[in-house]
């Protein structure tokens, strides 16, 4: 009996030692992370807002953590190709995703997705909210959102609303505005914001809910006129322009960007990335560059960003369903 007790105690001691060693290794892994370059997937081509934001923050993370955050552009299917590649990657912290509005929208817009974004992506950190701007051409007499709503109600279906394409945030921002303001406009989708803005300048279409970086040069030049921004409050870039919510209470349709990782990425790694990203977002030089992109930093926990991912996905799902937008096969 004594030998059995001794053997049992020895076995328990070895198990305890093994658990302690594994725990210490796990802690060391998180503490030392990253020990090699991190692949940061951006689901769009180089040069756009997604790419610019990732490169800005990635450069500072590379400096702070001593390993390169290598931007890998994987465009296609509205960002779905890039998202799926990250979702299917090893959850070890060495593959991350630039999260953007298309990820929230596509969950309801695409019929045959092989993933559920809020379920299959681990939220790491939010970066920035960028407003769209409700903008009209010189031929539109309305000087405020309220005047525009009154005009649209008096002329149902006669106002043309441009967008960068069906299902984009520029389209759905307008659909939400129509639903909440009780008006009807004709949607005119374009292949990107560039040609849409060109026709705005030419007077072929009357209104667009375009992204701040794309539209603000034309507003500042006086070629187009801003009626309202789509964030819940005014933007520091257009401080004299009210929010849509000042006229349509509850309206909010900004573009949220952040970092995601494969589900089951170790919590310690996510928390370390979150801490470093928040430190980067607090740097005055980075804040200045983000403001120049038209947005304001959103500093928070992984849990807070996860909650935002769910709420944004649900918001756009309702807009898509209420507008009767057909799913992309």
Task: Map each language-model feature to its residues.
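N-terminal (or domain-start) structured segment
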Residues: 29-119, 158-160, 166, 182-211, ...
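An extracytoplasmic/periplasmic, membrane-proximal ligand-sensing/linker region
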Residues: 35-37, 179-181, 220, 267-329
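Hinge/capping helix and adjacent helix->loop/strand transition within the periplasmic-binding protein
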Residues: 88-94, 109-195, 244, 249, ...
């Amino acid at each position: 009996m004594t030998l059995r007790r001794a053997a049992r105690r020895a076995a328990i001691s070895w198990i305890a030692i093994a658990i302690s060693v594994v725990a210490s290794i796990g802690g060391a892994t998180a503490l030392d992370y990253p020990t090699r370059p991190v692949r940061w997937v951006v689901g769009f081509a180089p040069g756009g807002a997604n790419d610019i934001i990732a490169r800005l923050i990635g450069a500072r993370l590379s400096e702070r953590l001593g390993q390169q955050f290598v931007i890998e552009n994987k465009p296609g299917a509205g960002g779905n190709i890039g998202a799926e590649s990250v979702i299917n990657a090893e959850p070890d912290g060495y593959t991350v995703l630039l999260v953007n509005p298309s990820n929230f929208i596509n969950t309801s817009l695409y019929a045959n997705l092989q993933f559920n974004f809020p379920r299959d992506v681990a939220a790491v950190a939010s970066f920035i909210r960028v407003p769209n701007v409700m903008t009209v051409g010189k031929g539109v007499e309305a000087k405020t959102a309220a005047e525009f709503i009154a005009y649209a109600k008096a002329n149902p279906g006669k106002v043309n609303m441009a967008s960068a394409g069906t299902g984009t945030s520029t389209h759905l921002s307008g659909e939400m505005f129509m639903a909440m303001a009780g008006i009807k406009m004709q949607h005119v989708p374009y292949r990107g914001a560039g040609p849409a803005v060109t026709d705005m300048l030419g007077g072929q279409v009357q209104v667009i809910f375009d992204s701040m970086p794309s539209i603000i040069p034309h507003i500042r030049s006086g070629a187009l006129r801003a009626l309202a921004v789509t964030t819940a409050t005014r933007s520091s870039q257009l401080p004299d322009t009210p929010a849509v919510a000042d006229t349509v209470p509850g309206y909010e349709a900004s573009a949220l960007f952040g970092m995601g990782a494969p589900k089951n990425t170790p919590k310690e790694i996510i928390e370390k990335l979150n801490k470093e990203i928040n430190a980067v977002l607090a740097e005055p030089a980075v804040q200045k560059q983000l403001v120049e992109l038209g947005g304001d930093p959103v500093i928070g926990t992984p849990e807070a960003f996860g909650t935002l991912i769910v709420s944004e996905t649900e918001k756009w799902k309702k807009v898509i369903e209420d507008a009767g937008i057909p799913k992309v096969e």
